[in-house]
Amino acid sequence: MNRSCWKMLGSAALLAAGCGTETEEIPPAQLGTCMGQTASVIRGAITTDTTFTADKRYILSGRVDVTNKATLTIKPGTILCGDADQLMMNVSYLNIDLDAKLIADGTKDQPIVFTSSRPVGQRRPQDWGGIVLRGHAPINNPPDSGKGPETTCISAEANAGMYGPCGTIRPTDSSGVLRYVRIEFAGREFAPDKELNSLSLYAVGSGTTLDYIQVHRGSDDGIEFFGGTANLSHAVSSACQDDAFDWEFGWVGKGQFWVAMQDLNIGNNGFEADNNRMNAALEPHSNPMISNVTLLGLGQGVVPGGSDKRQGIALRSGVNAKLSNMIVSGFSDVGVFFEEATIAQALAGKVSLTQSLFWQNGKTGESRNISDVTLVGATSFDVRAWVMGQPGNLEADPMLVDPFNPTAPKLTLKPGSPALTGGTPPSDSFFQPVTHIGALGTDDWTAGWTSFPAN
């Protein structure tokens, strides 16, 4: 029996396909508790095709690697728990290697849930590490600038393994499918810039399906792109302790229908957008195309303890981006922030922010929907004048039904909302041709599969 693969639930359980076909008595030490039920403990490496099913519970204990070009398939309705009792440096997380795949294809009625092994009421951010996908798509973070881009192969944060072209550039690389998936109480920070996010996407290619994903109460960023070409639709990042959505290292994917809801006590930016913080000129430039997003901060005037960044959209380190149909509200620092390194990109027409609404950003008694600072780089740049000079941008109440309810938010638009019309869909086949502004119109695509537990 391949003991590095996994141990199944039961006193005489049949091993799943790919881990052998014989039966074996499982000693009690190999069982655990997941959401109050007995579960099989998964540890080490999954090296052959394996399937997890909804009639059982599973505990991820320590780093669980899917490797050797194996595919891990998780059936709709399956619940997996990250072992919260692991020590700091042996944090539990699911790590999908280069050339391996994760097929977690849930449904609206049967989402796949990754959560903490602690009982309901005792769960908290950082209980486990989250999910890491690593692919072969392009990145702009070479270890040696004298080598060609196809040779780039660098180590992911938290020693998760190598990622990048690693000998062959594959823009359409596939790491599998994540659809109708919830990831709760995950993330772990070992040191600054040495972190696990709830969902970390390292050089993930456009052949990967990422649709209907919620990350909730993670200790670091909700979803972060480290280069690559991955596309993401119908995403909710709620109550995460750092940024809701973060990208760097040359991410050039597409996104539509995203929601960010920051926690009322701690939480940073809605978007933290970078090209490369070490060298803003590196190519490929981060240049995503993103439409129909609702970014909700902490509520106007709320300043969380210890948080120094409360910006709706932070455009930094030479990033390019095409952003449209955004709602940005409730960020207690500013709605839109520009770093000086991004000025040249905006002046060259490589950054756009259009058909968007900004409302009640800034501290109580002030309005800072857009940064009022005039930056002086190679050329003076008035952030407010630039943003409000872009087509279709307004400072107006989007009239969301109940946006700042932490446990039962309602993000659809009220009758008469200025966001019901005026949206312009991007000219790209990836995007659904809706004309509302923000992530939701009058239909709530988050209903039925998302959840917002406090603990």
Regions found by a protein language model. Give the residues of each.
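C-terminal motif of bacterial Sec signal peptides marking the signal peptidase cleavage site
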Residues: 16-18
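Extracellular beta-rich repeat passengers
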Residues: 23-76, 81-101, 105-107, 111-220, ...
